[in-house]
A protein has these predicted regions:
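Bacterial N-terminal signal peptides that target proteins for export
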Residues: 1-10
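Short glycine/proline- and aromatic-enriched beta-strand/turn motifs that initiate or cap beta-hairpins
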Residues: 22-104, 258, 262
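Residues on the lipid-exposed face of transmembrane beta-strands in outer-membrane beta-barrel proteins
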Residues: 47-49, 87-91, 133-137, 151-153, ...
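Extracellular/periplasm-exposed beta-strand and loop segments of Gram-negative cell-envelope proteins
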Residues: 56-82, 102-130, 156-180, 208, ...
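Solvent-exposed loop/turn segments connecting transmembrane beta-strands
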Residues: 79, 143, 181, 204-215
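Repeated loop/turn-to-beta-strand initiation elements of outer-membrane beta-barrel proteins
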Residues: 95-100, 142-145, 195-199, 227-230
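Transmembrane beta-strand segments that form the barrel wall of outer-membrane beta-barrel proteins
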Residues: 197-211, 236-237
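Predominantly the C-terminal beta-signal and adjacent terminal strand-loop region
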Residues: 212-262
Length: 263
């Protein structure tokens, strides 16, 4: 029971945070806007809280436990979620852009052990942070389309705590954590079908402390006004990281929904 709970909560925590992450529309860091309204200084800004209904599949290992294959559905997440926050911000000046994507989640749960000898109950909590900071440059632009070349660094940080109550291990606790950084590069693009409706997407790939880190998405958006727009689509993100018994080799994918405010 302890092993299953530990693995389950670790998967759910990383699944919620990973990312990643980028469910905004063409005003977002991962999808450039062709018709943004500039300020008097020439800068444009956008902020986009978003929601990514991502499931997760792959292999993980924490707390020195054997590597396990996992397949966590999205319905498992809300049973253990304590707090979650995801948002994107971008500043653009002409063909240049600077963007950030931040995700943080905290999850927890508990369960009784099968025999109650080593412990009567085990509690697990996990905090996960994932942040991407990058820059872009428009390599093509016309009245309907724009293509940006982008690059950046993504930081992952995962910390899990395990506490035992009752039995031989009463009062014993253990922590496991990992932090790593990857560099990514790729493209983002948008195409306006009408003044209100547009298509957008991106593709990033890289590595660093992870052997592989990649992120792709496609979406359709709708502009309600000059300051408010929304987007819906699908995103997939994969990362392959392992170090000193900590393994995170997974693919996360699912629908995205975002609301963008421009100022």
């Amino acid at each position: 029971m302890k092993t299953c709970l530990t693995r389950s909560l670790a998967v759910i925590g990383i699944c919620l945070s990973a990312g990643t992450a980028m469910a905004a529309d063409v005003y977002s860091p991962m999808a450039p806007e062709v018709q943004q309204t500039t300020t008097e200084t020439g800068w444009t800004f956008s902020f986009a809280p978003y929601f990514w209904a991502a499931g997760l599949s792959g292999d993980i290992a924490q707390f020195g436990l054997p590597e396990a294959h996992v397949d966590a559905s999205f319905s498992d997440i809300f049973d253990h979620l304590d707090f979650g926050a995801m948002a994107i911000g971008e500043a653009r000046y002409g063909p240049y852009s600077i963007f950030a994507d931040v995700m943080y989640t905290k999850i927890s749960g508990s369960a009784g052990t099968p025999r109650g000898i080593l412990a009567v109950e085990v509690e697990v909590s996990s905090e996960t942070f994932a942040g991407l900071l990058g820059a872009g440059y428009s390599i093509y632009e016309d009245n309907a389309a724009r293509i940006d070349l982008v690059g950046g660094m993504r930081v992952w940080s995962v910390e899990s705590d395990l506490s035992f109550s009752g039995g031989i291990l009463d009062g014993v606790s253990r922590s496991d954590e990992a932090t790593w950084v990857d560099g990514l590069a790729g493209f983002r693009a948008t195409y306006s079908i009408t003044p209100e409706i547009y298509l957008t997407g991106w593709g990033l790939v890289g590595a660093g402390q992870a052997d592989l880190d990649w992120d792709v998405a496609a979406a359709i958006g709708y502009r309600f006004s000059d300051t408010i727009s929304a987007v819906a689509g699908y995103r997939a993100l994969g990362v392959d990281y392992s170090d000193d018994g900590f393994v995170f080799d997974v693919v996360q994918q699912g629908p995205i929904l975002g609301l963008v405010v421009r100022f």
